[in-house]
Amino acid sequence: MFLKKVNDFITNDKFLSIFLFIVAILINQHYASRGIFPMDGFAHFDPGYRILNGEYPLRDYWVIHGIIVDYIQAAFFFLFGVSWKSYVFHASLFNGLLTVATYFIFRNFKLNKRYSLIYSFFFSVLAYTSSGTPFLDHHSAFFSLLGIYCLILAIDREKNLYWILLPIFFGLAFLSKQVPSSYVILSTFFVLFIYVVIKKKFDCLKYILISSAIFIIIILIFGNIQGISLDSFLVQIIYFPQSIGSERFADYKLTFKG
């Protein structure tokens, strides 16, 4: 009887998710200290520290990528102090949350606990450990992944909460980095259009639009509080990166000559 209770406890989804969460954090904490990319590894350390000291991106210094990662890092520095460990913990916590979300996606599709545990563990090893430290590409890709998870759950479970969360995660992905989030967002809207037309589920659009509007309003209010003008946001986040991309595309030549 006792062994059965122990077995039931350690095979419970809640216990397994907590186990994966802790393991994912420890894995990233370990590998983040094994080495560092000089350029990328500290990409958000200085911006996070500057925000903590009252210097804000877009207003006080120029950026060409999203700013969400910098603000999140500033929050970690505020809560845990300015140190290497608190810097890495940002990425580790994100790794843990993503791993748990992945586990529940597997379980949602009725994959047995053993395989869900193994696949989620492999995910935790490969997800944020390739960088170890907070990085805009990873945040953008993984916020996009959470958005895709919400789309899957919204269609499968037909719960309005997931439609509400969908634009929020995509908004955070875009504000982390414009690419790859833009490609994921456009692809998702294409899938969503097909779903709405075929299934006649027009109600979901209401929740998506309301959530999107609230998210945009919050961002505008936050920017106003920070003294960031809309013009600076559009120039640095939208227009200038777009001009870089257009120049690269214009110079691209498709040839079979190598």
Residue ranges of model-derived segments:
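Extracytoplasmic catalytic/substrate-binding loops of multi-pass membrane glycan-assembly enzymes
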Residues: 32-47, 57-72, 82-85, 226-230
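Short acidic/glycine- and proline-prone juxtamembrane loop motifs at membrane-interface regions
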Residues: 132-141
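Transmembrane-helix signature of polytopic, membrane-embedded enzymes
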Residues: 97, 102-125, 160
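Start-transfer (signal-anchor) and selected internal transmembrane alpha helices
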Residues: 1-27, 113, 206, 210-211
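Membrane-interface alpha helices of multi-pass inner-membrane proteins
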Residues: 124, 162-180, 184-189
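Juxtamembrane segments of multi-pass membrane glycosylation machinery
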Residues: 52-59, 72-90, 110, 126
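Membrane-interface transmembrane helices that cradle and orient dolichyl/undecaprenyl
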Residues: 108-113, 147-164, 173, 198
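Membrane-lumen/periplasm interface segments of specific transmembrane helices
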Residues: 205-250, 254, 258
